[in-house]
Amino acid sequence: MTLVFGSSCRLAVTLIFAFVSVFVFCEYVIYYLVILRCSWPLLEIEDSHSPLRALFLSDTHLLGAIRGHWLDKLRREWQMERAFQTSMWLLNPEVVFILGDVFDEGKWSTSQDWEDDVRRFKRIFRHPVDTKLVVLVGNHDIGFHHEMTKQKLERFEQVFNVTSARILTIKGVNFLLVNSVALHGDHCPICQHVEEELQKLSHALNCSIQGAQHNGQCKNAARFAPAAPVLLQHYPLYRVSDAMCTGVDTAPLDEQYLLFQERYDVISKNASKKLLWWFKPRLILSGHTHNGCEVLHEKLYPEISVPSFSWRNRNNPSFVLGTFSQSEFQLSKCFLPEERTVLVVYCSSCLIIALITLIHLKMFRNSLQFTNNLIGKHKTL
């Protein structure tokens, strides 16, 4: 009898250890195993200056108080926190850009809900002091154009220390940060202000590139590194659909030929032409669609749409790694663990543990019955 109960105790300890091991693997270890496969792309031309290493992600969609079920919040936010913290530890980027739709309900959240969302964001995306975090605005952060207000925009800009149009220069690399929600072209006050700022930035950047700061028209212009910028915004530039996209994580086939709506799925054709004409960017990075896309505008300007970072929007989220110099850049994509894989590991492990338990219980009953029979025979004797 003692041997039987001793065996049961050993099984219980083994099962607890198995459950803990599976949990640790699925919630911690798997992120290291997957992200370890990622590496920074190398530039083809060596530069005397060390290149800039930048990480780009998009559409985190932190759930709010209205639509966010607690279990959905817990699962998705934990996934993003582990993915981001593991990436920071393994890859150590110098700058991280989040390309909008940080929150899911910023467009209608109250001041109290907004503060709670911001607190959770800062916990999930905490980063080393030597890593710069730059956040762009998306339609879910301040609302679509007809929902956008000065109050919503200002509270976003105050929290993340951004403006709707500016050039950020790091290691001689110019990043043009644009509030694409305000590129509606209807001359609303916010839209008009953003367009005026973009024109000023275009003028100043062209003066810097041409080295004409002492020219009369450029005398009072701001100075930037003499290099074409990397354009960053939430909405993609105008394209008819995702049918022209290439890449391994494009939209599903049944969605690729759905026509995009200007100012809703992509910025307008006119706004796209203005940005390309004013800045002639060497690269465009955007989000919004939740799918990957690589497309070439006017056979000259490459655009990469960065997929969503959250399991809530896709099974295989990812982010983009970029290595930049003033004259060159290289990109690579880093995929995160797939939600389907984690669920399969959990289900398979639970099934195996259940089978082992059932087999042991059957053996336990047989042993108990055998012991009882022996005791009965002993009493008879």
Swiss-Prot record:
Residues holding a divalent metal cation 1: 101, 139, 234, 288
Keyword Secreted set for record: no
Motif stretch (Di-lysine motif): 377-381
Major subcellular location class: endoplasmic reticulum
Protein origin, superkingdom: Eukaryota
Keyword Flavoprotein part of the UniProt annotation: no
GO terms of molecular function: GPI-mannose ethanolamine phosphate phosphodiesterase activity; manganese ion binding
Pfam families: Metallophos
Cofactor, how bound (note): Binds 2 manganese ions per subunit.
Keywords on record: ER-Golgi transport, GPI-anchor biosynthesis, Hydrolase, Manganese, Membrane, Metal-binding, Transmembrane, Transmembrane helix, Transport
GO biological process, alphabetically ordered: endoplasmic reticulum to Golgi vesicle-mediated transport; GPI anchor biosynthetic process
Residues reported in the UniProt entry to bind a divalent metal cation 2: 59, 101, 234, 290
Documented EC number(s): 3.1.-.-
Compartments in which it is found: Endoplasmic reticulum-Golgi intermediate compartment membrane
Membrane-traversing stretches: 15-35, 341-361
Family, similarity comment: Belongs to the metallophosphoesterase superfamily. MPPE1 family.
Role description: Metallophosphoesterase that catalyzes the removal of a side-chain ethanolamine-phosphate (EtNP) from the second mannose of the GPI-anchor protein intermediate. Participates in the glycan remodeling steps of GPI-anchor maturation to allow an efficient transport of GPI-anchor proteins from the endoplasmic reticulum to the Golgi.
Domain remarks: The di-lysine motif (KxKxx) acts as an endoplasmic reticulum retrieval signal.
PANTHER family xrefs: METALLO PHOSPHOESTERASE RELATED, METALLOPHOSPHOESTERASE 1
Protein name, as recorded: Metallophosphoesterase 1
Native organism: Danio rerio
